């Protein structure tokens, strides 16, 4: 028997694809949401054939926030779990020269994800059950010259998830904040990432599935990142501002 569905936003991303396999393996029906969702037809067919679960495709644009309420209303079934894997790394130097890419990064990493989860939060609250998962970033723990546009948006998203968790804690709805650290994905392709600090998409998916099952609040996919960010955040601003980070 197929379990209640999991809704994956940003379903084309490597992490979302790994999550689709992880939840389908557990017998969960899947709702895959992305722009140009029809291009995920081969993924849909493979998941259904491989795991024997129902998989549906849903057109979704994170930046078209005026459509988010209708998107949720038109779902064939309200999911039990919703995971937002929407994000855009962008190029920091381009964002410093031109506000257009900067705003796109901010909207893709904060406004869009927060908007759709806010809509779902209201539906989950009315039902008094469900789990919302937001994939944020350790980059949001402290602003750094090398990625402060992206980091600032993730900082906002992390704060949003914290507040949402506080609001819904006694309403039967759980909120999970995921801080992956480096992940080997298409988004980071070409970057020199330290292997010891870099997770694979399947590793992130397993950590998220476990966090949902155990009702964890905030997770670092690799625990070493908790230590690293504790150290980074403890450096006095008078010293930190002169560091090359």
Describe the residue ranges of each PLM region:
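Conserved glycine-rich cofactor-binding loop
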Residues: 12-13
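Rossmann-fold cofactor-recognition segment
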Residues: 48-66
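Conserved mid-core segment of classical short-chain dehydrogenase/reductases
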Residues: 87-103, 146
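Active-site helix of classical SDR
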Residues: 117, 153
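Residue(s) in the substrate-gating loop at a strand-loop-helix junction
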Residues: 137
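Active-site loop immediately N-terminal to the catalytic Tyr-X3-Lys motif
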Residues: 142-148
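C-terminal helical subdomain
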Residues: 177, 193-230
């Amino acid at each position: 028997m197929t379990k209640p569905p999991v809704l994956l936003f940003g379903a084309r991303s490597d992490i979302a694809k790994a999550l689709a396999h992880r939840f389908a393996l557990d017998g969960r029906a899947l709702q895959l949401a992305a722009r140009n969702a029809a291009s995920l037809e081969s993924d849909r067919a493979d998941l259904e054939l491989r795991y024997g679960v129902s998989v549906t495709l849903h057109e979704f644009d994170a930046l078209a926030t005026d459509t988010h309420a209708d998107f949720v209303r038109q779902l064939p079934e309200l999911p039990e779990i919703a995971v937002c894997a929407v994000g855009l790394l962008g190029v920091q130097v381009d964002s410093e020269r031109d506000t257009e890419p900067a705003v796109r990064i901010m909207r893709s990493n904060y406004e869009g994800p927060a908007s759709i989860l806010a809509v779902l939060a209201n539906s989950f609250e009315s039902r008094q059950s469900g789990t919302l998962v937001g994939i944020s970033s350790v980059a949001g723990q402290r602003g750094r010259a090398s990625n402060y546009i992206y980091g600032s948006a993730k900082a906002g998203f992390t704060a949003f998830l914290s507040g949402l968790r506080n609001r819904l804690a006694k309403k039967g709805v759980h909120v999970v904040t995921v801080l992956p650290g480096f992940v080997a994905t298409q988004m980071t392709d070409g970057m020199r990432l330290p292997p010891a600090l870099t997770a694979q998409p399947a590793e992130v998916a397993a950590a998220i599935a476990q966090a949902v099952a155990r009702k964890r609040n905030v997770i670092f996919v690799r625990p070493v990142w908790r230590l690293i960010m504790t150290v980074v955040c403890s450096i006095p601003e008078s010293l930190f501002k002169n560091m090359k980070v």
